[in-house]
Amino acid sequence: MKMAVDDPTYGTPKIKRTASSSSSIETTVTKLLMSTKHLLQVLTQWSKGTTSGRLVSDAYVQLGNDFKVVSKFFMHAKVDMSDVGDVPMALRRVLEVTLREPPSDETLNKHLPKIREIIVTLLDKLKVKQAILKNMQQEHRISVKSHHQQNPSFTSNLSLGSEGTREGTPLSSRKSSIVRDQRQSDSVENSYGEKVNSTSTGTPSAQSAEATLTKPRTNIKQNLKSNNAPNASDDDDALSQLKKGTNLQRRASKRYSAYHMAKLTNQSTTEAAAAAGLMTTPSPSMLHLEETVRKSKLYGNNNNDDDRNINSAENKGKSIDDVSKASPLAKTPLPIENVRASPRRLSSVVTTSPDKAMNGTCPVFLRIGDKTKKCHVQLPTTKNALRLLFIERFAYSPGANSFPDIYIMDPQYGVFYELEELNLLDIKEGFVIELKLEENPNNTIKEFIDTVKMEISNSQNDIIRHLKEMSFGSAISGKQTEVLPQPGLEANKHDLVGQNKKDDDKTIKDIQYELGKIKQVHNINRSNINETIFNILRKVDNFKSLSFSAKNSSNRMYMEKSQTELGDLSDTLLSKVDDLQDVIEIMRKDVAERRSQPAKKKLETVSKDLENAQADVLKLQEFIDTEKPHWKKTWEAELDKVCEEQQFLTLQEELILDLKEDLGKALETFDLIKLCCEEQEKNPSRSKSNPILPIMRPGTFNQVREQVMVAVQSLNPDHDSRVEAIDKAEKMWEMERKLKASNEFDDELENFVGNSNLKKSGGFEEVERIRKQKDEANLRAYFGPGFT
C-alpha cells in the first residue's frame, strides 16, 4: 500500500470522481425537489377534484425513486444516510389515509401538515449531508496537496533518471505532459486559493503574504516571454481553456434547488436563491491566484529560481492558514451568538411584566411613519399575520406596489433591522414593529404628471409649427408653378416620341413583374394580419365571457393558469439546458482529453439546439414581460399570496439570467470545440503523435509491476457513475442515429423551404395573369387583330 501512495497519480482519479459525483448529487437533489413540488401540486389538484388518486400515486412513486437515487449517491460518497430514515414509507402511510377520505380542502388541510413535516425534515437532513460532503471533499483535497508536497513521486524519479533520453523529445510532447500534470492538480489548487482568498481580507499578515505571492508571478511572466515557442498556434489557448472545464457552472439548477428547498423549509427564498447564484461566481482574487499557480506549474520546470519562488509562495500559503486558525477574527460567530442571546435574556425578563394578557397574547407596538399604535399578537406569529395587522389597525393598502419591508427594534441596542422568517421567534413583549414606507410617493407622482404635461404641450406646439410651415411652403410652390413659363414641353414631346418602343415595353414588363411580387407579399401579409386579428378577437370574446365573481374570480384562475404555464416552461427549459450542458461536457472531454474530433453533423445539431434554447429563453422573457403587469393588478386584491408570487417571479427572472449565463458559457465552450476541430483539421498529424515514454532503470520492472497490481486491487468501481455515463451515452447514440437517418438532400430541402428561400415570382395571381395574356394573344393571332 505504501507503493500505491507513492504513485504521483494516486488520489487524482478520486478527485475527479468526487467532483463528478458532487455535480451528480446536485442534479439528483434538483430532481428530488421537482418530484416533491409535483407531489404537492397533484395533492392540491386532487383536493379540488381536478385529478384522480392515480396521479397522486404516480407522483409518490416518482418521489420514492428519486429519493433512492439520492440515497445511493450519498452512500457512494461515504456519507451516512441511516439517520434519514425510510421517507417513502412514512409518506405512504399518510397518503393512504388521505386518499381513503373524499377529496376536499378540509381533507388536505387535515393531512398536509404531516406531509410537509416529513418533507421539511428530509430537506433539512439533505442540507446537512451536502455540507458534510463538501467538508469531506475539501479535507481530501488538502490531504492530497500536502501529500504531493511532502513525498516525491516514484514516476518523477524514473523520469529524472532518464534525463538524457528526455532531452531528445520534442517540445509538444513535453508540453502535453506538463498540461496533464497541471490538469490533475487544478482541483487541489482551487481549495488552496480559497483559503488564501478568505484570509487575505482579514489580517495584516495575510496582506503581506499576498504581496509575497505576487513576486513569483513576475518571474513567471518573464519565463513566459522568454520560453514561448515561435511556432505556437492559437489552438493552445482554446485547448487549455477546454481542459480547465470551468465554464459550465449550472447556475440555474443550483438556484432552482436552493429556492425550492428554502420554500419547503419556510426560509427566505430570495436570499437562498441569491446565495446560490453567488456560490457559482468565483472572486477575482481567487481567479488571479489560480492563474498564478497554474502558470507556475506549467513553466516552473524551466528555471530553478522559479521553483524556489513557488515553494516560498506555498510556504506563505501555509503561514496564511496558520494565521487564519490563530486569528481572533475567525471566531467572530461567538460574540454574535452572545449578542443574540443577550436580547433574548432581556426579553425573557420583559415577558414577566404584568401587562401580558391572560389569553396568551403579548403587547407590541406598531408604527407607520409618525403614527404608533399598541396591539396584542399571538406569539409565535408570521409575517402575513403582521401585514394583516397593519392593514386592520392603520387601514393601510400597498396598492399596486409591493408590500413594504417590516423592521423590528432590538431593545438592547435600539437599532432597527429587517424582520425575516428566521427572526420571527425573536419578537417578544414590548417590541416595536415598524413598516418602512417610501418617502413622499405623492411628490414623485406629481413630478411625473407635470413632466408628462410639459412633454405633451411641447409636442403640440411642434406639430402646429410644422403644419404651418408645410402649408406656407405648399402655397409658395403653387404660385411659382403658375408664374413660371413652360418652354420645354414641345421639346419633351419630340424626345418621348423618338425613344425606342421596345425599351418601353421591357420596362413596363419589369414593372409589372415587380408589382406582381409586391402583390404576392401583400397578400401573404394580409392573410397573416387577418388571422392574427381573428385570434385576438376570439381571445377578447373568451375574456368577456369569463365571470368576475368574488369567490371564483377569473383573475385568480388566470393567475394560476399563468403560473402553471410559466413554471412548466421554465422547468422544461431548465431540463433542456442541463441536457445540452451534459452533451457539451462530453464533447469537451472528447476534444480536450481524448483528442477525438466530433462529426460535423453533431456540431451543427448542437449549434441548432443552442440557438433553439436561446430562442426559448427570449420567449420566456417575453412571456414574463407580458404577464407581469397583470400579476401586479391581481396582487392588489390578494395580499396573502403576493410575497410568494413575487418571489416566484423573481426566481424566474433570475433563472433567465442564469440560463443566459449558462447558455453563454455553453456557447463559449462550443466555440472552443469548433476552434479546436478547425485547428485539428489544419494539422491532422499532431493528434496522431505517439508519446515517448522514459526508459526504466535496470531492475525496477518488478517494482513497477507490484505497484500496478496494488493500484488495481485498490480500485473502487463507481457503478452509479457508470450508469449515468450509460444514460448520457444513450442520448448521444440517439442523436447520432437521427443524424445518420437524414441525408444531405433532406437537410438542404428542409432548410431551403423552412427559411422561405423560394424565389418570389408573384404567386398564382401572376401566373394566371400571364396565362390570360397568352390566351388573348393566341385568339388575336387566330381570329385577327380586330378580335376582342
From Swiss-Prot:
<feature type="region of interest" description="Disordered">
    <location>
        <begin position="140"/>
        <end position="253"/>
    </location>
</feature>
<dbReference type="GO" id="GO:0005935">
    <property type="term" value="C:cellular bud neck"/>
</dbReference>
<dbReference type="InterPro" id="IPR051825">
    <property type="entry name" value="SRCIN1"/>
</dbReference>
<keyword id="KW-0175">Coiled coil</keyword>
<dbReference type="GO" id="GO:0071474">
    <property type="term" value="P:cellular hyperosmotic response"/>
</dbReference>
<dbReference type="GO" id="GO:0005519">
    <property type="term" value="F:cytoskeletal regulatory protein binding"/>
</dbReference>
<dbReference type="InterPro" id="IPR005613">
    <property type="entry name" value="AIP3_C"/>
</dbReference>
<dbReference type="GO" id="GO:0000131">
    <property type="term" value="C:incipient cellular bud site"/>
</dbReference>
<dbReference type="GO" id="GO:0032880">
    <property type="term" value="P:regulation of protein localization"/>
</dbReference>
<dbReference type="GO" id="GO:0007124">
    <property type="term" value="P:pseudohyphal growth"/>
</dbReference>
<dbReference type="GO" id="GO:0005628">
    <property type="term" value="C:prospore membrane"/>
</dbReference>
<dbReference type="GO" id="GO:0051286">
    <property type="term" value="C:cell tip"/>
</dbReference>
<feature type="modified residue" description="Phosphoserine">
    <location>
        <position position="233"/>
    </location>
</feature>
<dbReference type="GO" id="GO:0030010">
    <property type="term" value="P:establishment of cell polarity"/>
</dbReference>
<dbReference type="GO" id="GO:0030950">
    <property type="term" value="P:establishment or maintenance of actin cytoskeleton polarity"/>
</dbReference>
<dbReference type="GO" id="GO:0007121">
    <property type="term" value="P:bipolar cellular bud site selection"/>
</dbReference>
<feature type="modified residue" description="Phosphoserine">
    <location>
        <position position="342"/>
    </location>
</feature>
<feature type="compositionally biased region" description="Polar residues">
    <location>
        <begin position="187"/>
        <end position="225"/>
    </location>
</feature>
<dbReference type="GO" id="GO:0005816">
    <property type="term" value="C:spindle pole body"/>
</dbReference>
<dbReference type="GO" id="GO:0090338">
    <property type="term" value="P:positive regulation of formin-nucleated actin cable assembly"/>
</dbReference>
<keyword id="KW-0597">Phosphoprotein</keyword>
<feature type="region of interest" description="Disordered">
    <location>
        <begin position="298"/>
        <end position="338"/>
    </location>
</feature>
<dbReference type="GO" id="GO:0043332">
    <property type="term" value="C:mating projection tip"/>
</dbReference>
<dbReference type="Pfam" id="PF03915">
    <property type="entry name" value="AIP3"/>
</dbReference>
<feature type="coiled-coil region">
    <location>
        <begin position="573"/>
        <end position="628"/>
    </location>
</feature>
<protein>
    <recommendedName>
        <fullName>Bud site selection protein 6</fullName>
    </recommendedName>
</protein>
<feature type="modified residue" description="Phosphoserine">
    <location>
        <position position="327"/>
    </location>
</feature>
<dbReference type="GO" id="GO:0051127">
    <property type="term" value="P:positive regulation of actin nucleation"/>
</dbReference>
<dbReference type="GO" id="GO:0007118">
    <property type="term" value="P:budding cell apical bud growth"/>
</dbReference>
<dbReference type="GO" id="GO:0030953">
    <property type="term" value="P:astral microtubule organization"/>
</dbReference>
<dbReference type="GO" id="GO:0008047">
    <property type="term" value="F:enzyme activator activity"/>
</dbReference>
<dbReference type="GO" id="GO:0000133">
    <property type="term" value="C:polarisome"/>
</dbReference>
<dbReference type="GO" id="GO:0003779">
    <property type="term" value="F:actin binding"/>
</dbReference>
<dbReference type="InterPro" id="IPR056279">
    <property type="entry name" value="Aip3p_Bud6_N"/>
</dbReference>
<dbReference type="InterPro" id="IPR022782">
    <property type="entry name" value="AIP3-like_C"/>
</dbReference>
<dbReference type="GO" id="GO:0051017">
    <property type="term" value="P:actin filament bundle assembly"/>
</dbReference>
<dbReference type="GO" id="GO:0099503">
    <property type="term" value="C:secretory vesicle"/>
</dbReference>
<dbReference type="GO" id="GO:0032956">
    <property type="term" value="P:regulation of actin cytoskeleton organization"/>
</dbReference>
<feature type="compositionally biased region" description="Basic and acidic residues">
    <location>
        <begin position="305"/>
        <end position="324"/>
    </location>
</feature>
<dbReference type="GO" id="GO:0006903">
    <property type="term" value="P:vesicle targeting"/>
</dbReference>
<dbReference type="Pfam" id="PF23153">
    <property type="entry name" value="Aip3p_Bud6_N"/>
</dbReference>
<feature type="modified residue" description="Phosphothreonine">
    <location>
        <position position="12"/>
    </location>
</feature>
